[in-house]
Curated annotation (Swiss-Prot):
Disulfide bonds listed in the record: none
Protein name in the entry: Pentatricopeptide repeat-containing protein At4g38010
Pfam families linked: E_motif (PF20431), PPR (PF01535), PPR_1 (PF12854), PPR_2 (PF13041)
Gene Ontology BP, a term: RNA modification
Region Type E motif: start-end pairs: 478-554
Segments annotated as PPR repeats: 70-104, 105-139, 140-170, 171-201, 203-233, 238-268, 269-304, 305-339, 340-370, 371-405, 406-440, 443-473
GO MF annotations, alphabetized: RNA binding
Organism: Arabidopsis thaliana (Mouse-ear cress)
PANTHER family: PENTATRICOPEPTIDE REPEAT-CONTAINING PROTEIN
C-alpha cells in the first residue's frame, strides 16, 4: 500500500478545507503514527481552526493525542474560534477541552473573553472571570486587558473600570480597551476624559476611538488636533483612521473637511461611502448625497449595503424624490439585500413623506417586526399629508400593542392635530407626553406645533402664555404663527415686550416678517429696534418686494 511522505501530508493538510477530506488524511496520519509529530500537530490545529463547524471534531482529535499536546495547541484553536462568525463555539471548545483534561494557562483566557464580548456573553464571561481569579491568573496583564475589553464592549462600564483601576501596570492595550468600551457604549465624554489621562503613547486604535467620541460630543478642536498628528505620522495613515476622520467631521457638521478627507483616501470601502453619504443627509444636503451615491455606483465597484441604501432612502424622502426612492426599493428586492426592520422603516418613511400613503401602508403592514421608528415613519407621513385622524388612530393602536411613544411619535401626533384643527386633542397629547407615564420634555418643535395649532384656532392668548412658559427661545415657525394670529385679530400692537424682544434674535428670509416687526416697533416708539431690523435687512440683502409675505405664506400652509 502506498504511504505518502510526511512532506506530502503536510502539504495536503495545508490545502485541505473539507472535514471529509481531512478524515481521509487523518487515516494516513494514524497509520504512520504521525499525530505525535510537532509539525503535523501544528498543521492539524491550523486546519481545525479554519471553521467553527470543526469545533466538535477538534475536541475528539485533541483528546486522542492529549498526552503529547502542549497548551499552545489548545490556545491556538481557541484564538481561531474567537475571531470566527460563531464566537459561542469558543466557549463550547474551552469547556470541552477542560473537561477532557486540558489545564488552562494565562494565554487561554484572552480569546475566551474576546469571544464572550462578541456575543455579549455577560454570564459566561463572569463565570470565567471567577475561574481566572481562583487559578491565580488575574494579575496577568494580558488577562486583565482582555477583561477590560470584554466588560467594556458588553456595556459593563463599572466592572471594566474596576479591573482597569486594579491593574498594577497599564500598557497602550489597557488604555485603548477602556476607551473603546466607553466609546462603544455611548459614554463619549468618559472616553475623552480617560484619553486626557493616558500616560502611554496612543496607537492607531486609540485615535480611532477618540475621533469617534470627539465627533459625538462635537469636540472639533481635539478631532482636528488628532488629524494633524495623523498627517505627521505615516504609521497612523490608514483607511480606518480616514473613515474615523470623515465620521468626526460629519458629526461636527464640517462637511468641507469631511469631503476633503474622503477625496484624499487612496482606497474607499463601504464605511467610507456610507459615512459621507449619511453625513450629507444628516446635514440636510440630500441632493449631494444622492449625487455621491450615483458616483459610487458608477466609479467605485462597491455594491451598496443596507446602511448606505437607508441613507439614500432618507435623502429621497427629504427631497420628495419618489422615483429615485422607488428605484432603491426595487434594487433592494432584486439584489438580495437582507430585508430588516431598519430598511423596511426607511422605505415606509420615503413613501409616506413623498405622499404615497397607500404604498407606505402596504409596506408597513408587511413588516413583521416593527419598532417605534417604523410607527413614527407612518404616523409622520399620515400627519403631513392630510390624514390627521388616521395618524391619531394608528397612534392609539401603537400604544395598545405595547409600543412606547417617544418624542418623535408625539410630534407626529401634534402635527396631526395641527393639520386637522383638533385643539382639544392637541392639548391632550401635549400634556400626555409630560405625564408620569411618558415623562418626556417637549422640544422646540413640540411647542411650535402646539402654538401653531392654538394660533390657527384663534386662541392667541393661550398661545402667548405658552410662548412665555417655554424653556427655549421661539423660532421662525412660532414667530410666524403669533404674528399671523395677531394680524388676523388686529392686535399687532398688543404683543408683550418680552415676546417682541425674543423675536429680535430670529433671522428670517422673508421681507414681510421684517417689515411687520419694524412697523410694530415703530408703533411702540422702539426706534433703535427699527434701525436694527433695517440694518439686518440690508446685511442680508432683503428688500420689501411686492407679492405674498412670509406671514401670508405661513397662513396658507397646509390649507
Amino acid at each position: 500500500m502506498y504511504l505518502p511522505e510526511k512532506s506530502v501530508l503536510l502539504e495536503l493538510i495545508s490545502r485541505c478545507s473539507s472535514l471529509r477530506v481531512f478524515k481521509q488524511i487523518q487515516t494516513q496520519l494514524i497509520t504512520r503514527d504521525l499525530l505525535r509529530d510537532d509539525l503535523i500537530i501544528n498543521k492539524v490545529v491550523t486546519f481545525l481552526g479554519k471553521s467553527a463547524d470543526f469545533a466538535s471534531y477538534s475536541s475528539v482529535i485533541l483528546h486522542s493525542i492529549r498526552s503529547v499536546l502542549s497548551s499552545f495547541s489548545y490556545n491556538t484553536l481557541l484564538s481561531s474560534y474567537a475571531v470566527c462568525d460563531k464566537p459561542r463555539v469558543t466557549i463550547f471548545a474551552y469547556k470541552t477541552f477542560v473537561s477532557n483534561g486540558f489545564s488552562p494557562d494565562m494565554f487561554t483566557f484572552p480569546p475566551v473573553f474576546k469571544a464572550c464580548g462578541k456575543f455579549s456573553g455577560i454570564r459566561e464571561g463572569k463565570q470565567i472571570h471567577g475561574i481566572v481569579t481562583k487559578m491565580g491568573f488575574y494579575d496577568d496583564i494580558y488577562v486583565q486587558n482582555s477583561l477590560v475589553h470584554f466588560y467594556g464592549v458588553c456595556g459593563e462600564s463599572r466592572n471594566a473600570c474596576k479591573v482597569f483601576g486594579e491593574m498594577p501596570v497599564r500598557d497602550v492595550v489597557s488604555w485603548t480597551g477602556i476607551i473603546t468600551g466607553f466609546t462603544r457604549t455611548g459614554l463619549y465624554k468618559e472616553a475623552l476624559d480617560t484619553f486626557s489621562k493616558m500616560d502611554v503613547e496612543p496607537n492607531l486604535a486609540t485615535y480611532v476611538c477618540v475621533l469617534v467620541s470627539s465627533g459625538r460630543v462635537g469636540c472639533l478642536s481635539l478631532g482636528k488636533g488628532i488629524h494633524g498628528l495623523i498627517l505627521k505620522r505615516a504609521s497612523l495613515i490608514s483607511l480606518e483612521t480616514g473613515n474615523a476622520l470623515i465620521d468626526m467631521y460629519v458629526k461636527c457638521e464640517q462637511l468641507s473637511d469631511a469631503m476633503r478627507v474622503f477625496g484624499e483616501l487612496e482606497k474607499k470601502d463601504k464605511v467610507s461611502w456610507n459615512s459621507m453619504i449619511s453625513g450629507l443627509v444628516h446635514c440636510e444636503r440630500s441632493k449631494e448625497a444622492i449625487d455621491l451615491f450615483s458616483l459610487m455606483q458608477t466609479s467605485s465597484g462597491i455594491k451598496p449595503d443596507g446602511h448606505i441604501l437607508t441613507s439614500v432612502l432618507s435623502a429621497c424622502a427629504s427631497l420628495g424624490a419618489v422615483d429615485h426612492g422607488r428605484w432603491v426599493h426595487e434594487y433592494i428586492l432584486t439584489a438580495g439585500i437582507k430585508w430588516d426592520t431598519h430598511i423596511g422603516t426607511a422605505i415606509v418613511d420615503m413613501y409616506a413623506k413623498c405622499g404615497y400613503i397607500e404604498t407606505a401602508l402596504e409596506i408597513f403592514n408587511g413588516i413583521r417586526s416593527k419598532n417605534v421608528f417604523t410607527w413614527n415613519a407612518l404616523l409622520g407621513g399620515l400627519a403631513i399629508h392630510g390624514h390627521g385622524l388616521e395618524s391619531l388612530r394608528y397612534f392609539e393602536e401603537m400604544v395598545k400593542l405595547g409600543f412606547k411613544p417617544n418624542l418623535v411619535t408625539f410630534l407626529a401626533a401634534l402635527n396631526a392635530c395641527c393639520h386637522t384643527g383638533l385643539v382639544d386633542e392637541g392639548r391632550r397629547y401635549f400634556h400626555k407626553m409630560k405625564s408620569r407615564e411618558y415623562n418626556l420634555f417637549p422640544k422646540l418643535e413640540h411647542y411650535g406645533c402646539m402654538i401653531d395649532l392654538l394660533c390657527r384656532a384663534g386662541l392667541l392668548d393661550e398661545a402667548l402664555e405658552l410662548v412665555k412658559a417655554m424653556p427655549v427661545k421661539p423660532d421662525v415657525r412660532i414667530c410666524g404663527a403669533i404674528l399671523s394670529a395677531c394680524k388676523n385679530r388686529g392686535t399687532l400692537m398688543e404683543l408683550p415686550k418680552e415676546i417682541l424682544d425674543s423675536f429680535l434674535d430670529i433671522e428670517f428670509e422673508d421681507s414681510g416678517v421684517y417689515v411687520l416687526l419694524s412697523n410694530i416697533f415703530a408703533a411702540n416708539r422702539r426706534w433703535d429696534d427699527v434701525a436694527r431690523i433695517r440694518r439686518l435687512m440690508k446685511v442680508k440683502g432683503i428688500s420689501k418686494v411686492p407679492g405674498s409675505s412670509y406671514i401670508e405664506k405661513f397662513m396658507t400652509l397646509d390649507q
